[in-house]
Regions:
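Acidic, polar-rich low-complexity tracts and alpha-helical solenoid repeat scaffolds
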Residues: 1-86
Length: 86
């Protein structure tokens, strides 16, 4: 449980520190290890945001679309839909 939270927050911290590439990788490692975590939708959303910050909009779009498909009722999916409209 602690490792799960630590891995998630490490990815968030990288994003907050503008280390976007590290954020994408760390959050993917978190998702791969804890695919059923309640934080997966948030992790995918932050990956998309990190990719946008890296000017990798096409990749970000794929992450947002995946989020909307896999977690359509999540708050993050609603935000992802807004990001796709921009």
């Amino acid at each position: 449980w602690y490792e799960e939270r630590a891995m998630y927050y490490m990815g968030i911290m990288y994003n907050d520190n503008k280390e976007y590439g590290k954020s994408v990788v760390a959050l993917q490692e978190f998702i791969d290890k804890y695919p059923n975590s309640k934080n997966v939708p948030s992790a995918i959303y932050v990956q998309g945001e990190s990719l946008l910050a890296l000017d990798r909009a096409d990749e970000a779009k794929l992450f947002f679309e995946d989020l909307i498909t896999r977690f359509p009722k999540s708050n993050e999916a609603k935000e992802a839909k807004k990001r796709l409209k921009k």
